[in-house]
Amino acid sequence: MTDHTNADTLRTPIVAVLGHVDHGKTSLLDTIRGSAVSEGEAGAITQHIGATDIPLDTISEMAGELIDPTDFDLPGLLFIDTPGHHSFSTLRARGGALADIAVLVVDVNDGFQPQTEEAIDILRRTGTPFVVAANKVDTTPGWNPQDGQPIQRSLEAQSERAESMLNENLYEIIGQLSDAGFSADLYWRVQDFQKNIGVVPLSAITGEGVPDLLTVLMGLSQRFMKEEMAIDVQGPGEGTVLEVKDERGFGATIDTVVYDGVVRNGDQIVVGGQDEPIVTEIRALLQPRPLEEIRTEKKFEKVAEVGAAAGVKIAAPDLDRAMAGAPVRVVRDRPVEEVVEEVKAELAEIEVETAENGVVVKADTLGSLEAMANALREAEVPILRAEVGDIAPRDIAVAETANQDEHKAILGFNVDLLANAETELENADVKLFTDEVIYQLIEDYETYVEEKQRAQQETVLDKVVRPSRFRILPDHTFRQNDPAVVGVEVISGTVQNNRNVGYFEGNEFERVGQLSGIQKQGDDVDEARAGERVSIAIDGPTVGRDIEEGDTLWTEIPEKHAKILEQELKEEITADEREALAAYLETKRKRDPFWGK
């Protein structure tokens, strides 16, 4: 990295646009691109692979009076086109975020949504400066559109009612930013952008407020990031893989954003791979053909070199195991081993902590894998294996080895189930969860675990002897023995058929026999609850000798069952069962304080 800050060596700041699905990220990028193309003459935009480069002259044309181009020596802005399904967290560079600055798009009517919260978390974690684009101002009831105008000029044309409704929504968003720990205000009221987040009201459809957004982005980049934009224009290129794609005639290619130095055709490069760094040689550097030539048979044209900052498609052998989000390094005049170690070191920063038992995690890129691992750690969900890529048969085989049923699960973020893994999954005892929102994915898994644990507890509850205390009613002896049949009232707990029963003599439990039948109003039943009166048949005792009318009897609880009831199922049993259990344990523990512990 050089210390130069002359215009020749200042690169274009990299801008990422992120936000909740349907809040208008794509429309905003399309509007910025479209307006830039329509301004045309002043130095039309360059469409890169995975990015759009808008030069300062074009921004100046679009922003009109808001910008004086002589105030700037940065060359323009490079907007990264992160498709809706791509998490911003994919964009890493040297341990931080690839983007120098971000635009968080929020629907002015909806405010913060799940993916907004997720984006805010990532921005906070990576320390990326950002502005908020409060989109869809044109949907405010009674709005009078002023196409392409700066927002304050547009506001002058609105009725008091429309402006007041918009302000209400804007201050709702400013409040939500405050709740997330960020001080924010409408951008023209912000005195210090290092301490406060600027909110830019705009419409991606009418273009209102878009000049303001470009002005704020240029101003922030020029003021606070100029030194970081200084690059060694001839140095070995450094970049980040956006996506790995198969292209006809080229095989596996990597869409890459170059953020430092220069990449040339024929360069030897090192790329982060799924198993180990890939050392290969560039066969072709590809850029999209200009828009007017897009209908030609060839989508791409070859270029000799690409300097930072730019998006480019790199074609080279052995790239099929390259990872989205991984580093790309040009070797040039250095030992290749040194560059391999550099890439390994960067990948090591993203190593996910795994446990001997846990779930399998798959994500589309290294950055999102890292974000998933962080979120799972916070949720205290252990990870057995974490990898980039779609879900393959071996992932299912690994998930099946988990010791606990709840860990026999795969959590996939922005990934697909490969065709050859579908049959495996159908035949395996493995649960698959996929989603495009990390927090939703984890919430679905946690709900599944809770339901599974509840079902297991219910199964245990079905097998365990339930506590009960009941009294033989006076004048309710229907048969004295073989079996004794008496009427009883259940005082607390649940009387179950086929259980041993008895009474306490001092602190000793005396078993008198086993229940062999329960009848309620003449019908056979399996159990009787607190407050019910039923007749029961007891094999073993004789009424008048072993038991008497008025006696209180208890269900005999095996010690192992008492321990499970007290330690694992206390919340699952009813209040009166807890009462019967507590009284039973209290009496048993007078003789042996450690009974059932």
Swiss-Prot record:
Region of interest (G1), ranges: 19-26
Span list, region G4: 135-138
CC terms in the record's Gene Ontology section: cytoplasm
Chain residue ranges for the region called G5: 203-205
Gene3D superfamilies documented for this protein: P-loop containing nucleotide triphosphate hydrolases, Translation factors, Translation initiation factor IF- 2, domain 3
InterPro entries associated with the record: EFTu-like_2, EFTU-type, P-loop_NTPase, Small_GTP-bd, T_Tr_GTP-bd_dom, TF_aIF-2_arc, TIF_IF2, TIF_IF2_dom3
A single MF term (Gene Ontology): GTP binding
Pfam families membership: GTP_EFTU, GTP_EFTU_D2, GTP_EFTU_D4, IF-2
Residues of the tr-type G domain: 10-226
Job description of the protein: Function in general translation initiation by promoting the binding of the formylmethionine-tRNA to ribosomes. Seems to function along with eIF-2.
Protein family according to the UniProt entry: Belongs to the TRAFAC class translation factor GTPase superfamily. Classic translation factor GTPase family. IF-2 subfamily.
UniProt protein name: Probable translation initiation factor IF-2
Origin species: Halorubrum lacusprofundi (strain ATCC 49239 / DSM 5036 / JCM 8891 / ACAM 34)
Lineage start: Archaea, Methanobacteriati, Methanobacteriota, Stenosarchaea group, Halobacteria
